[in-house]
Swiss-Prot record:
Positions where Phosphotyrosine occurs in the chain: 426, 457, 742
Pfam families: C1_1, PH, Pkinase
GO cellular component: ciliary basal body; cytosol; nucleoplasm; plasma membrane
Top-rank EC class of the record's enzyme: transferase
Record-given protein name: Serine/threonine-protein kinase D3
Expression across tissues: Ubiquitous.
Superkingdom per UniProt: Eukaryota
Zinc fingers typed Phorbol-ester/DAG-type, residue spans: 154-204, 271-321
PANTHER family noted in UniProt: PROTEIN KINASE C, MU (PTHR22968), SERINE_THREONINE-PROTEIN KINASE D3 (PTHR22968:SF26)
Effect of residue 716 to M: In a glioblastoma multiforme sample; somatic mutation
Molecular function terms from GO: ATP binding; diacylglycerol-dependent serine/threonine kinase activity; kinase activity; protein serine kinase activity; protein serine/threonine kinase activity; zinc ion binding
Phosphoserine: residues carrying this PTM: 6, 27, 37, 41, 44, 213, 216, 364, 391, 395, 442, 539, 731, 735
Domain PH: from-to ranges: 416-532
Amino acid sequence: MSANNSPPSAQKSVLPTAIPAVLPAASPCSSPKTGLSARLSNGSFSAPSLTNSRGSVHTVSFLLQIGLTRESVTIEAQELSLSAVKDLVCSIVYQKFPECGFFGMYDKILLFRHDMNSENILQLITSADEIHEGDLVEVVLSALATVEDFQIRPHTLYVHSYKAPTFCDYCGEMLWGLVRQGLKCEGCGLNYHKRCAFKIPNNCSGVRKRRLSNVSLPGPGLSVPRPLQPEYVALPSEESHVHQEPSKRIPSWSGRPIWMEKMVMCRVKVPHTFAVHSYTRPTICQYCKRLLKGLFRQGMQCKDCKFNCHKRCASKVPRDCLGEVTFNGEPSSLGTDTDIPMDIDNNDINSDSSRGLDDTEEPSPPEDKMFFLDPSDLDVERDEEAVKTISPSTSNNIPLMRVVQSIKHTKRKSSTMVKEGWMVHYTSRDNLRKRHYWRLDSKCLTLFQNESGSKYYKEIPLSEILRISSPRDFTNISQGSNPHCFEIITDTMVYFVGENNGDSSHNPVLAATGVGLDVAQSWEKAIRQALMPVTPQASVCTSPGQGKDHKDLSTSISVSNCQIQENVDISTVYQIFADEVLGSGQFGIVYGGKHRKTGRDVAIKVIDKMRFPTKQESQLRNEVAILQNLHHPGIVNLECMFETPERVFVVMEKLHGDMLEMILSSEKSRLPERITKFMVTQILVALRNLHFKNIVHCDLKPENVLLASAEPFPQVKLCDFGFARIIGEKSFRRSVVGTPAYLAPEVLRSKGYNRSLDMWSVGVIIYVSLSGTFPFNEDEDINDQIQNAAFMYPPNPWREISGEAIDLINNLLQVKMRKRYSVDKSLSHPWLQDYQTWLDLREFETRIGERYITHESDDARWEIHAYTHNLVYPKHFIMAPNPDDMEEDP
């Protein structure tokens, strides 16, 4: 039958076809009516049903014989049709034998019914009425199937985020980017660039989908829809849903069109014409799948098809060059490399790590919902070194997101209950021993009236517990009572916990009532661990006889006023909430905490010294050393530092959230210009203080701009100085620092950098705040992108943003450092020299009672401006002098 005679309701398929066992000779010359024996799996022959049960039953059950595989299927009687049966056959083959699929299988299979009473046992089915209950239906491949059909097996490609360095299986180049770097085939697992999607051959092996042929499908009526027509290509849409199962997602990309595939297959294959080639991007040999190492002349490239390989592999490559394939009149093979300098450690990328480490499917990002376009309407990207055309109305940039660095931003599993059980106690105020059902979680110890009710006698926050000690005070014990087992000491009361009955053996009956030394010791151990959850359990003192508690761990405490105290345990001063992860930096994880005596909320960065070599310990203390010398309202305040042999604890003030969270939670995932001006001015004022002291932050990004409150116009403070450097006004540094998405080109290229590095980051912050996307695409050179205004500032959303904002961004995102704006020049830019912004800042300074952003010398100028333009000039602003005047004069 013709390929164009498929039912209108069924989309044209590129499903895997009948397995090799379906027909012993699956070739165009095979007989269209050759079937295998109708023997059942139990050895007996099937007998056709003499009556059709559709009149009395709502479903029809029959057997499908596909080669040596037999499946029992059930179809609703009212839905039984020849088209439905063929759909079901395609689905079974697609699931059990995906590597045997071919183009247009639906139109090239024949169905035969086994009739044992007929001389010709196999009877061709031309109508669904010929299928009866219990029949055996043989699936046979038609002679219309050609060799080309078997060789065309399109890939099923999905946008994928890779966690390890991965290379394109078409061009051999690395897949660049932070997320959604490329496309992965669900069938064979190969990886491709998005730009290579329309060039790759339709040769999917389907090895990842293969199901054992002797394993039945989950249900007899399972029906899997056939793939979409190969003439249509699915592209990402801006509106979509996430967290779809890989098997349920709609394929987002396809390979080259079928007509091109057939044209290529007709070409004569000739030997490759190899020439020595220098690669500017990390590339692998497409024969042995290993990295082409070296600075230049790393390997050989075919002049015609651009196949890349080692010199040693050139003689082993099959002679299958097809020349340069054109698509819509344009070259479809890989073009010349674009010059994007990037340093890659060859030791970190090998044949094992370059692929296979990223097979875990991640939830599809929101852009993966599909709509369909005819490929003739699509412009194929050129790989030549040129500026690519960008959509004039929308941005192709990566959406703004939280960038995670070396330490995974993971939250400790929050256990609602650490320990629970009956326990007895009395207090320093009441010597009557009471029995309650204790429940210990990560933040408090609650004494319930019973084990099932919600009423409780007392709640003891862990942050109020000053220390746990062995039994020392027996003055309050009742006469004739047994002594307690340990003491919980708070600022207002002492809890004497447990009852030591003198029996060292374990008594389950007494333990269930809260009496006994062993049950009390288990509670003491659990509470000690809850008080210091980030300390390894092996390091925590658990024996009641130990009086030093945690003091053997903590060796010193360094306070911001330079006082040093020996043997001070951080758990006696602060309570760390392990399930309250505020964020993670390069060197540690930040937890929420509370000062035990005052109840003040703090943020505690816990740095694991064991993660870093001894020679880097000085770098770990760099943040503390810098913060100790910084006292500015726009910079997070350091309270103190604790150090143990294993960890460093940096205690800082706790703020409400960060700027990135504010951006992402906004209505359009971007900020209005008014709020952006307000926050950027504060960032620049804090940077001015840093640069005046020759301190460069080196890792400025929205995650490191903290907000003091949830107000629409909040106070902002800079944090995370782990990368900060002391750099003089005319000095340069070369060490690699910071987060790549916000770093200036000179750092990424390992060139010398100075304090202007922070100004580039400010430009990126302004860009992402106003647009909600990163300014640069990972696949293109920054110079080319900056010069392409259509790429940098697409009408959506930049038509709504003032030209002054764009001008400031352009002056900050200058590749040449000497052309980049300084702090003072940025503060003087017309975009920030705005009367409304000045009013917002003055209102904020009046609210907090401190003037440190604006300067009193500007008051007269703005008063004249208000008078000239008939604007209201408030008189209630505070007039206190700027504190910066006393320590700097920039």
